[in-house]
Structure formats: structure tokens, C-alpha cells
């Protein structure tokens, strides 16, 4: 209810509030709720955007700002590069897939790099953990059902190994998933009780299973950095970076796109082959950008 609390609208939970011109949900003008920011920009893009921006971005506002409030974990997802988005958008248009179809992947021809800044403490999964550290986590869990996949990563402790393990985990059969997740639950509970190094990762895994059941995304989450942003800290999600927001309120700036490829932890459309096509499997070693000291001025929030 984070956004409802901020804007005093608490009739129902609100996960996102968009400020932009994207056709999926253009912002309404405070002075005229029948007119959108998209309408204003379209009427005179050179005046509203400036000639250089209007020329470079085909008369479109190039970014989308969101307030995001995650009470429960959001989907495991990644976003395409510009070339991938353009190709995917053209392909689905040629196939006659309606823009509002629930199984459509590409709603526009734009990429979607994004940066999120925590307004509260903000928990997320972001990018692949360094493979050696992931091996240490799996060794601590010591789940026999996962050992074949652990050995795959041990044999190739790099992006190739991460790709192989994730490809295997995300395509397990329902019976295999149930067996692996049940065994990993028991191991994670043991690590939580021991209150050792991998408590946060174990608690997160258990929470995902509680929320989504035998979902492959819960196992894939064990490959990712589990991070916590303090207020003012940020993380940049480049194209192809696998991530999932877990809990907290943040402000997010991104390219003007709504292209999302999902791989789990959701009831929405999942397209595993397309997700694996766009995901980058290199480890993310230093994900968090520290907060800068800021002060309030007549121009808003500026560096101190």
C-alpha cells in the first residue's frame, strides 16, 4: 500500500504509478484529467521536448518515470536490447499478434534499461552472483537433488556454466521441480536455523516458495545476487539483466518501454525461450550504487 499511503488513496493496493507518455498508461494532467501527457507532447513535440530531443526520439518523450511499491515479490524478468526489441516488435506485428494480447512479448520497439532508487529499504534479486560464491551457497545447502546442476557449474564456473544451469532449472518437469524445491526448502530452513552466512538467500527462497509454490523461478533465484538498497542507494538494470523486485518502495527511471520477458514468479505470460534469448549470463559483481549526500533547495533535491 506504499503508493496509496503517499497519495492518500487506499481503496486498494497500488503497485506502480507511471509518469510518462507510453501508450500503455500515459499520465493524466492534474489540471485536465481528460488530457494526457502523450496528447500534450503529440500536439507540439518541438516545444514540449526541445528540437534536439524531438528529432532524436521521433517526437516521443524518451523516458518513463515510475513509482513502484512491491509488497510481494514481482516476476523474475529481463528486458531486451534495442536491436532485440525492434526485431521482436516487428516479428510479432508480422505474425498478427494484437498489441494487447496477453501472450505478446514486445509492446513497443524500444529497449528498457532502468535505474531504481530506494525510497524505503528495498529488497531485490539483481544479476547473477559470482559463480564461485554460488557454488558456496549450493554446497552449504547440500541438496542431493541439485547436485547434477551444481557439478555443471563447478565444471564451468563462468557465464557458460550459469547459462547451462539456468537453462536446466527453468525447464525441469513438474515432478522434478517439486522434488528439488521440497528438498531445498528443508535445506534452506536448516540454514535459517543456523543463522549463518546464507540466511538472507534462504529466507528469500522460502518466501518465494510460500508465495509461488513449485515455481522454477524460486530455484533460479538462488543464482542471483540478493541485494538490499538503503534509501538513496540505486541499482542499474541493463538490457538482459535478470532481476526480480522483492519488497519496498522506489522510484524508477527507464527508457520509454514496457517490454518485459518473464521467466517465473508470476501468473502472467512466460516465454522461456525468448527470455533465454535476451538474458546476459555474466556475473554482476558490484551491483549497488551508493547514495550521495543531498540537500533540499528551490530546485528540488540536489547533491550537497
Predicted regions and their residues:
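Short, small-residue-biased leader/transition segments that mark boundaries at the very start
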Residues: 2-7
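A short glycine-rich, His/Asp/Glu-containing loop-to-beta-strand
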Residues: 10-22, 62-67, 289-304
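C-terminal, non-catalytic macromolecule-binding modules
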Residues: 249-300
